[in-house]
Amino acid sequence: MNKNNIIGFLLIAVVLIGFSWYNQPSAEEQRTAFVQDSIAKAKHAEMEKASKAAAAKRQTDAKAKVEADSTALFYSALKGQAKKIVLKNEKVELTLNTKGATVEKAVIKGYVGHNLQVKDGSAEAKDVTLFEGNDQSLKFMLEAKEANIITSDLYFTPSNVTDKSVTMTAVAGEGKTLTLTYTLGDDYMLHMSLQANGMAGLFSPNYNKMDVDWSDKARQQERGFMFENRYTTLTYHNAEGGTDHLNEGSEKIDEKIEETIDWVSFKNQFFSAIIVSKDNFEKDAFMTSIPQEKGSGYLKQFQAKMKTAFDPTGKKASEFEFYFGPNDFQILKNTEKESTFGKDLEFQKLVYLGWPVIRWINRFFTLYVFDWLSNVFPMGIVLILITLLLKLITYPMVKKSYMSSAKMRVLKPKLEAATAQYNKPEDQMQKQQAMMAEYAKYGVSPLSGCLPMLIQMPVWVAMFNFVPNAIQLRGEKFLWMSDLSTFDPIFEWNTNIWLIGDHLSLTCILFCVANLLYSWMTMRQQRDQMVGQQAEQMKMMQWMMYLMPLMFFFMFNDYSAGLNFYYFISLFFSAAIMWTLRKTTDDEKLLAILEKRYQENKNNPKKASGLMARMQALQEMQRQQQAEMMRKQAELNEKKNNLGK
């Protein structure tokens, strides 16, 4: 760069700096500009605030417009005085409120209610009140062009009132009405139809469904909160068949049902409220269950939000049916005859009878025997008779099992002599084979003792599922038990103790004592027939068996007195049968019979039974595999020793 270029750049820089300095505002101008900028910012903030206020005003005006439209649409129905209409028959008494045109109280006759919502105990026992007042809410929501119509906000005018029917009408304007008609049958079913008249112009042309919002605060009806709460569920029925329920726990549950359903039930342990839609409820119904605190008098808060068909033209009514009644299997099954929808509603599935195999036992045996006996005897006697009947049915197999154990007991000296040479751990396979061979000589099957237990276990599980759901036991007294459907406390206290709760159940204690006695008898019987190390192992296992009654105590202290009483008498009879068989069995005669059989088999050997032959073949295969493994291990050890040398 030459000298002229440098001078030129310097002059340009001087000009730029001078021009910038010349155009720089003075201090006064800067202050003025700052003030103006502050004013501009304030104006901008004010404009934003005004814009927000205007938007809020527009929303308020829009809301006011909707309210004004709604008032104009149902001016006469939005104001009024609520009246009570009572529908009743010999089974139920339903109180309807003209505000909302819904059932606000349901009383089930013939079942004693405890009214646990009254905490001071001043209320006397009377018929069961399923819900009352704000416990229950049902509203239908219709989306009109300019406003939503919510039935719970409207006052309806009753007409054609009888003991079993009523028509309720809300007037929307000239020639425009919304009518709900209720008809009570002779049982627990209430039919309801909702129909619009002259309102087609209020809705969009394609509008054909409405929202149904049903909620209920399930009352505690029984004494045991934890036990009743376990059987209190929100249950729904698939339109294609089959029921399901929310998996309620200790937290709030929200669930979307991705299938079409035709009814929803808010189910207590022994009573249910059900809503059925003739045209079904559409997919994506939203169900909620919220647990309630113990001592509040309530169990769970249920809510079901659904959609179903609605005809704005009024040519077709939206029809519903309600069931307010007991969870009695036969009553629920026969209720379908009261329905006018012609559906297989399967209400009886609300009574849980167990898994498929267990349900089959309860459905086709326990239910029929229970109903038959309960028509003649008190419920406590029915439980005893059912136990005796089951013991009578299983007695031949129990006796066969005991005789098999007795044969093994009298053969114990011979087994010890035959297996005396197999004392090493690696000789256990040979020892088992020697024992099986000795049993085969005398025609004894060591597996025959398992059959009775395999048969009795499904019966025990069946009763475990049946008794807690048997409403026939509710309120029934027997001996010291005031109610067979709940626990029978011998002691109670106010503080909740972990694992025990706030009481001690007498029938649970009796059940556990009987279980301890029966375990001691069976363990001694099994120990008497064991040989060598098996007997020592049995001594160690018996302590585990003795812990079972203690575990059962913590598990069943909250369970019903009826179930614990059944288990108590079942174990008592089992112990009595075992004691009788032991006293009537002569070991010397039994051994003589076995010796005679041995001589007969020795002179005319018989082929082993299929099961015994398979066991012997399996043991022989295991012996060969063990021998092969030992041979390979010996070869490997020999190679290691040779390498070491």
Task: For the regions a language model picked out, list residue spans one by one.
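Helix-loop-helix
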Residues: 1-54, 96, 193-197, 206, ...
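Short, Gly/Pro- and small/polar-rich lid/capping loops
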Residues: 49-82
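Soluble non-transmembrane domains of integral membrane proteins
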Residues: 77-345
